[in-house]
Amino acid sequence: MYMSTDEVRNAFLKFFESKGHQIVESSSLVPHNDPTLLFTNAGMNQFKDCFLGLEKRAYTRATTAQRCVRAGGKHNDLENVGFTARHHTFFEMLGNFSFGDYFKEDAIAFAWEFLTETLKLPADRLLVTVYETDDEAFDIWNKKVGVPADRIIRIGDKKGGKPFESDNFWQMGDTGPCGPCTEIFYDHGEHIWGGRPGTPEEDGDRFIEIWNNVFMQFNRQADGTMEPLPKPSVDTGMGIERISAIMQGVHSNYEIDVFQALIKAAAEVIGYEDLSNQSLRVIADHIRSCSFLIVDGVMPSNEGRGYVLRRIIRRAVRHGNKLGAQGAFFHKLVGVLAEIMGTAGEELKRQQAVVEKVLRIEEENFGRTLERGMAILNEALDNISSQGTDGKVLDGETVFKLYDTYGFPADLTNDVAREREFAIDEEGFEKAMEEQRQRAREAGNFGTDYNAAIKVDTQTEFCGYTGTKGSSSVAAMFVEGNEVESLSAGDKAIIVLGETPFYAESGGQCGDAGEIRTESGVFRVEDTQKLGNAIAHHGVMAEGVLAKGDEVATIVDAERRAAISLNHSATHLLHAALRQLLGEHVTQKGSLVKADGLRFDFSHLEAVTAAELKEVERLVNAQIRRNHVIETNVMDIESAKKKGAMALFGEKYDDEVRVLSMGDFSTELCGGIHASSTGDIGLFKITSEGGIAAGIRRIEAVTGEGALDAIEAQAAKYEEKLAESAQKAKSLEKEIQKLKDKMAAAESANIMGKVQDINGTKVLIAALEGADNKNLRTMVDDIKNQVGSGVILLANVNDDKIGLIAGVTKDLIGKVKAGDLVKMVAEQVGGKGGGRPDMAQAGGTDVAALPAAIQTVQPWLEERL
């Protein structure tokens, strides 16, 4: 019976829902509450605290289709991806879980029913394994389910290994929950090489594990003894790719519908015809992990999860390059992936444009260095080959140079080397890497962090949410990392109290400042930091003395605290506004909240435009004007997520969390100090925006009076610039006039050749273009001086307007008056004018009539001279 991957997923979830299981959404690929994990790599990750008894949920049965990534860290399948039938960087794990509810009998019965009745797999193609001493599981399979004994294989401990070190015994660590497993295998047939589990040929591809059921039955003690758990649990996992291959009648995972669609799409965008090429498999796998990592907030970078993403992208691009890809191609597969993932691709569809953009930019950036790096790598490999030595090995220094200088991940270099049958000097590479780390450590060693050096057992109770004053006693004091019994004036120290209203730096909010007072002295608190479960007050003994055990009054600088709280609340509004405007890919990557402003780092690929920044300000200030009451509620983490609260990636949260809400605009998990209402913020103003790393932008902003100061400073700058511009304009006008005067003088000289004689009098009649009336007057005066005695008429056309200037030397005004002359011409061109007998001007609008009007001047003068 053929089933698509999407149909398999839905059938699994519906089956277990019918068995009383709660369908739980796939958790993020970035584990929120487990700092030990780079990526979510198993279905049980999100339920870890449930299995440990640290968290209780509203259900005791759950089922999921969990997205997983294995690339980087302990679980790294990257170098095998594309070269085997079942290795992937991204996969989906179908799972059903029991938290102290049902156990082995039901788990085994559920698995068998789903496989043989829902999926209708032939029972004779299935065989199972149990832990060697797990007679209970063996009997359930044999006597209750009916699997023949010869198809149930007992698997013991590995030879030479520790007790319980077996493929069929699961353990979280050296101590803690553990228990036996039972695995279900599918027989792909005699035509495929491979032996049954437990035989020397078990690594063949004939018998493939499809479902693992882990029975958390014991709690292993430090001495190795196994104590039965009061409430045993079940954790199961079935890879959707493997079971889909069976349901679609194929052997390799890369032959199922999801991968075939991606392989065909990749071949099409690259222009490559051989669909069996392994590079197409690599690309098809990598687009899945890259796309969903970006959906879950990971951005390409040079560290941590971002660097793993960058490595996967670059590996895919390099394989596309091998196949002859021209230009960016990888991002073009996102739409195909979103469609073929069916119901599991809805979030990818919503963020498709963002994912495509991230991949395209990263691919284009890498494309500029790929060619150069490949040239260096191939040259190095060619040099080694030419030496003809046995055992071709690429030295670690070259691998490091490619990584450090050209951004070539070591595994990409390893891929290329392996294709050319070279080995990598991994030891030499690690040595070069360690030398670089040491240089970085030495460069960053600026002083002693006494806070990190101090160990203290005290647990400080924080009482600062409701006030800025309190009383307590001194639990411990430290000077330069050493515990002391007393302090004197001038001592720089760290004080730990039993209870304090001082907020310790956390979540980007800086620590409080203020005073710790006694009758005998004052300690000025300059900063407050966390110290394990204690709160450390850093500062100086301003006056008097202080001793361990003294009763003290604690006084936070309330004005400073208030300013910090306003900026912290504004940070939440800024985060929400950025996500609303730029997209849900925007996630907080860091922040700093101080009394005089805030700094917010977030994931985004491009500079935020001036128009976008203006809109962000508008959105934030609109929420400030609405004066939302800032509500704080304490609830369990699951309830917080259902409420839509944003959690910060990498942050570890307690079972109970503080949820901060500002109307329906912003809901976040936050333990910081905030304003009472958004209106208290007053005003929000962005002062700068810029990039701090690949894909990470930074906004700095101020609020309240600081925002007013920033606006006034900006206005003052504008006024200053306007004054400067006005002054420059005046200077330019003067320069322009000087140039015009020079041009007029030059023009006067040029037109002197047009002077004619009428009845013994020198006459100049000329039409010009582009001059202004002031220049014409200057020209007339210059010409009068040059001719000594004469009559001048100059006409000028400028912007479809006519300017006329007439000049007559004083010895001729008894015969010809300038006003009469200019009036006569003006009347012919639709204008009028007049002036003194020796100088007159007029205007007109009929440009077409000007040539004919000019022709009438000479006859008119001949009659009068």
UniProtKB/Swiss-Prot annotation:
Superkingdom of source: Bacteria
Cofactor(s), names only, from the UniProt record: Zn(2+)
EC primary class: ligase
Free-text remark on how the cofactor is bound: Binds 1 zinc ion per subunit.
Principal cellular location given in the protein's record: cytoplasm
InterPro entries: aa-tRNA-synth_II/BPL/LPL, Ala-tRNA-lgiase_IIc, Ala-tRNA-ligase_IIc_anticod-bd, Ala-tRNA-synth_IIc_core, Ala-tRNA-synth_IIc_N, Ala-tRNA_ligase, Ala_tRNA_ligase_euk/bac, DHHA1_dom
UniProt cross-references to Gene3D superfamilies, sorted A to Z: 2.40.30.130, 3.10.310.40, 3.30.54.20, Bira Bifunctional Protein, Domain 2, Threonyl-trna Synthetase, Chain A, domain 2
Any GO MF annotation of the entry: zinc ion binding
A GO biological process held by the record: negative regulation of DNA-templated transcription
Protein keywords: Aminoacyl-tRNA synthetase, ATP-binding, Cytoplasm, Ligase, Metal-binding, Nucleotide-binding, Protein biosynthesis, RNA-binding, tRNA-binding, Zinc
Cystines in this chain: none
Compartments, as annotated in UniProt: Cytoplasm
Residues that coordinate or bind Zn(2+): H568, H572, C670, H674
Swiss-Prot/TrEMBL catalytic activity: tRNA(Ala) + L-alanine + ATP = L-alanyl-tRNA(Ala) + AMP + diphosphate
GO cellular component: cytosol
E.C. code: 6.1.1.7
Domain description: Consists of three domains; the N-terminal catalytic domain, the editing domain and the C-terminal C-Ala domain. The editing domain removes incorrectly charged amino acids, while the C-Ala domain, along with tRNA(Ala), serves as a bridge to cooperatively bring together the editing and aminoacylation centers thus stimulating deacylation of misacylated tRNAs.
HAMAP family recorded: Ala_tRNA_synth_B
Family, as annotated: Belongs to the class-II aminoacyl-tRNA synthetase family.
Job description of the protein: Catalyzes the attachment of alanine to tRNA(Ala) in a two-step reaction: alanine is first activated by ATP to form Ala-AMP and then transferred to the acceptor end of tRNA(Ala). Also edits incorrectly charged Ser-tRNA(Ala) and Gly-tRNA(Ala) via its editing domain.
Protein name (record): Alanine--tRNA ligase
Phylogenetic placement of the source organism: Bacteria, Pseudomonadati, Pseudomonadota, Gammaproteobacteria, Vibrionales
Encoding gene, per UniProt annotation: alaS
